[in-house]
């Protein structure tokens, strides 16, 4: 890699819902598309269409009528490697239009990703895509870097899973990481259910996308849920209208904050788990007493499901109620947090000090996939 001064590393953040990919040193990902692979339900139906055996991302989304859709990543963890390979292939060749054998690749992984998975990612990069070098970084750690910190606790909540990850001087503390299987997809489902109770019918995958759009545009988190609920009964101040693709306009009021309230009260959808505030607190309590102060003072939100208005203030209020009374609590919600994992990767892969951290192809050839545990931690 000594001569590779002019070669930009690629950064690929594979989420349950969306793939974020681009070039190290950029301030935002070039390509953002759904993590979906679609295969034709009936082969040879579309005569003369030059039908592909698989479609990825937006194309799969738009042709979903004739396809069977699969999500190769569930709850942040890859569970279907053939489809994952298709997604990476699409990322390199169709979205970024690069030859992966010419660029180092930084991939991201969920916290507590199984060891076998890291090895499989490493193997595919070197053997299928022939990358000259690669690295695997934990998503939450990258978000923390993107916020300009090396110590703090990250609440990373995406489409398929949420994690609370305490990080001290750049290293995640695995014994204190907690996973919550409650994230964006569950909120969309909950909003679909609330709207169905009101007499609107949203059931198909296409309609789910409409509800997701509604959730993203109109939902917010109440500072005081009960009080907001009372206000919404007597006043129309929380009402907003939303135009559906067919031109029909629906008005939603209390649904706007009832939907994401589930993050703080999972019991609303029948889950027994503690909410995101309590999970964050529990994570901090699993850490050494000497570093808790640094964690309470650096609570960083990351991921698309933390994009709701009001989330920072509410989180601050809830954690203040749980923490020791003298503790200084700071919740940081960076405006670009939807992409902060990717941005952190872009920063890391461009650092001159990081250049000796890459796993080189020669090292892989010598040691095999297990090299990833020695070089990426």
UniProtKB/Swiss-Prot annotation:
It catalyses: ATP + H2O = ADP + phosphate + H(+). SUPFAM superfamilies: Actin-like ATPase domain (SSF53067). One of its GO terms (cellular component) is plastid. Disulfide bonds: none annotated. GO terms for molecular function: ATP binding; hydrolase activity; structural constituent of cytoskeleton. Keywords: Acetylation, ATP-binding, Cytoplasm, Cytoskeleton, Hydrolase, Nucleotide-binding. The modification N-acetylalanine is found at residue 2. InterPro entries: Actin, Actin/actin-like_CS, Actin_CS, ATPase_NBD. It is found in: Cytoplasm, Cytoskeleton. The keyword Nucleotide-binding applies. Pfam families: Actin (PF00022). CDD domains: ASKHA_NBD_actin (cd10224). The keyword Nucleotide-binding applies. SMART domains: ACTIN (SM00268). It is an enzyme of class 3 (hydrolase). Little or no reproductive-gene expression is detected in vegetative organs, such as root, stems, leaves, sepals and petals. It comes from the Eukaryota. Polymerization of globular actin (G-actin) leads to a structural filament (F-actin) in the form of a two-stranded helix. The binding of profilin to monomeric G-actin cause the sequestration of actin into profilactin complexes, and prevents the polymerization. Belongs to the actin family. There are 8 actin genes in A.thaliana. Actins are highly conserved proteins that are involved in various types of cell motility and are ubiquitously expressed in all eukaryotic cells. Essential component of cell cytoskeleton; plays an important role in cytoplasmic streaming, cell shape determination, cell division, organelle movement and extension growth. This is considered as one of the reproductive actins. This is Actin-4. It comes from Arabidopsis thaliana. The gene is ACT4.
């Amino acid at each position: 890699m000594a001569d590779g001064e002019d070669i930009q590393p690629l950064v690929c953040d594979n989420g349950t819902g969306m793939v974020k990919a681009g070039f190290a040193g950029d301030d935002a990902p070039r390509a953002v598309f759904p993590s979906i692979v679609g295969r034709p339900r009936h082969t040879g139906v579309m005569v003369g269409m030059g039908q592909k055996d698989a479609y990825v991302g937006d194309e799969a989304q738009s042709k979903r009528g004739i396809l069977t859709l699969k999500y190769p990543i569930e709850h942040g963890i890859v569970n279907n490697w053939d489809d994952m390979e298709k997604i990476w292939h699409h990322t390199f060749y169709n979205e970024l239009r690069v030859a992966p054998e010419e660029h180092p690749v930084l991939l991201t992984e969920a916290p507590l990703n199984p060891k076998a998975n890291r090895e499989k990612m490493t193997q595919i990069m070197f053997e299928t895509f022939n990358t000259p070098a690669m690295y695997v970084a934990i998503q939450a750690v990258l978000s923390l870097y993107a916020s300009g910190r090396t110590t703090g606790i990250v609440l990373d909540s995406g489409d398929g899973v949420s994690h609370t990850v305490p990080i001290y001087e750049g290293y995640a503390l695995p014994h204190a990481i907690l996973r919550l299987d409650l994230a964006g997809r569950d909120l969309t489902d909950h909003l679909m259910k609330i709207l169905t109770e009101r007499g609107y019918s949203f059931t198909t995958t296409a309609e789910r996308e409409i509800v997701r759009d509604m959730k993203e545009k109109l939902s917010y988190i109440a500072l005081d849920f009960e009080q907001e609920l009372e206000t919404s009964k007597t006043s129309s101040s929380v009402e907003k209208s939303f135009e559906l693709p067919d031109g029909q306009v629906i008005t939603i009021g209390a649904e706007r904050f009832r939907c994401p309230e589930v993050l703080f009260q999972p019991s609303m959808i029948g889950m027994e788990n503690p909410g995101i505030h309590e999970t964050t607190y529990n994570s901090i309590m699993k850490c050494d007493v000497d570093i808790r102060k640094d964690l309470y003072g650096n609570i960083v939100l990351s991921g698309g499901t933390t994009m709701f208005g009001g989330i920072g203030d509410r989180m601050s209020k809830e954690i203040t109620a749980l923490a020791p009374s003298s503790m200084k609590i700071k919740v940081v919600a960076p405006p670009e947090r939807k992409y902060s994992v990717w941005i952190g990767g872009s920063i890391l892969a461009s650092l001159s000090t990081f250049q000796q951290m890459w796993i080189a192809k020669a090292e892989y050839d010598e040691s095999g996939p297990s090299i990833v545990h020695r070089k990426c931690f």
